[in-house]
């Protein structure tokens, strides 16, 4: 069994407690307008080309089996329609202008890499977080990986948007120590506007995980143009959870514009950023509902 991995991030400190390694699986069931990891949306391998970093060395041209790269009068050009997704060019790029997202790996190939930092996990109270995209789109792989991690005494976290079936959740719940769960909106119309999908199953799954007595850290991407008026509703919802450990309010940023360009993807990022006052108000609103830890 294999999965398509978009990235591995060692020494991560924002994807759960302690020092962690975060495994980013490719493919997502939502399409959030503010997505800051567009390389994780699609399920197929993708090559990112950062033209401003290219030094026109020509290494990719000589190696590319499909002729997708060319050096001409106006420098390096890349024809994405010819790319077969092998990623070989990114391995020889001298200017770091090419980044390949989508390495195919088995659990047995991935596990030793994750165990390399076991000492750091143990001393910091960390572990391994499986994320995406939406990692549970590759649930069988996740379940096998999480099981192997638990067999090796590693703390596990699943970072999910929750837009999956309950049967899918059941595959990973036994091997997951904590869920990092995104809540973007309670109002379904708002959620559809934000993500392209309804949220009925997402809210149902949140309550289901809680009923399984699994710790839940809720993450709220705070995007003023879209969900500023949802904070009270979210607070009411979270107040009903028995296993909520903390809530993180994640202020929207628009740093990912260059990623969209490098992948030839439409940039849907909103223009308006949250100011300090609106962010503070959101946090204080959530605290009104008796939530002990809001960050």
Which ranges hold each PLM region?
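Auxiliary Fe-S-binding modules of radical SAM enzymes
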Residues: 2-17, 210, 222-295
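Short gly/ser/thr-rich secondary-structure transition/capping motifs
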Residues: 4-6, 72, 159-163
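N-terminal pre-triad scaffold of radical SAM enzymes
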Residues: 6-59, 76-85
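N-terminal-biased segments
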Residues: 15-17, 24, 41-42, 46-47, ...
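Hydrophobic packing within well-folded, soluble alpha/beta domains
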Residues: 32, 54, 60, 64, ...
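Iron-sulfur cluster-binding cysteine motifs and their immediate structural context
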Residues: 33-40, 59-78, 88-104
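Conserved AdoMet/S-adenosylmethionine-binding subsite of the radical SAM
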Residues: 108-262
């Amino acid at each position: 069994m294999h999965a398509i991995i978009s990235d591995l991030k060692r020494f991560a400190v924002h994807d759960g407690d302690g020092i962690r390694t975060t495994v980013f699986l490719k493919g997502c069931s939502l399409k959030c307008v503010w997505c800051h990891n567009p390389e994780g949306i699609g399920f197929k391998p993708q090559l990112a080309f950062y033209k401003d970093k290219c030094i026109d060395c020509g290494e990719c041209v000589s190696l590319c089996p499909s002729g997708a790269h060319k050096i001409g009068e106006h420098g390096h050009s890349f024809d994405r329609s010819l790319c077969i997704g092998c990623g070989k060019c990114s391995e020889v790029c001298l200017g770091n202008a090419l980044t390949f997202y989508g390495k195919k790996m088995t659990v047995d190939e991935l596990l030793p890499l994750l165990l390399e930092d076991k000492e750091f996990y143990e001393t910091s109270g960390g572990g391994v977080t499986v994320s995406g995209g939406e990692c549970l789109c590759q649930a069988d792989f996740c379940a096998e990986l999480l099981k192997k991690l638990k067999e090796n005494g590693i703390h596990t976290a699943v970072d999910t948007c929750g837009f999956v079936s309950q049967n899918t959740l059941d595959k990973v719940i036994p091997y997951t120590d904590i869920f990092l769960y995104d809540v973007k909106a309670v109002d379904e119309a708002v959620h559809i506007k934000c993500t392209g999908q309804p949220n009925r199953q997402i809210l149902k799954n949140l309550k289901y995980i809680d009923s399984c007595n699994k710790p839940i850290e809720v993450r709220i991407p705070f995007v003023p143009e879209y969900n500023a008026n949802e904070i009270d509703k979210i607070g009411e919802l979270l107040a009903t959870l028995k296993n909520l450990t903390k809530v993180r309010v994640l202020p929207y940023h628009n740093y990912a514009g260059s990623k969209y360009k490098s992948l030839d993807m439409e940039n849907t990022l909103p223009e308006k950023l949250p100011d300090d006052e609106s962010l503070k108000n959101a946090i204080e609103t959530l605290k009104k509902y008796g939530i002990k830890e809001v960050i």
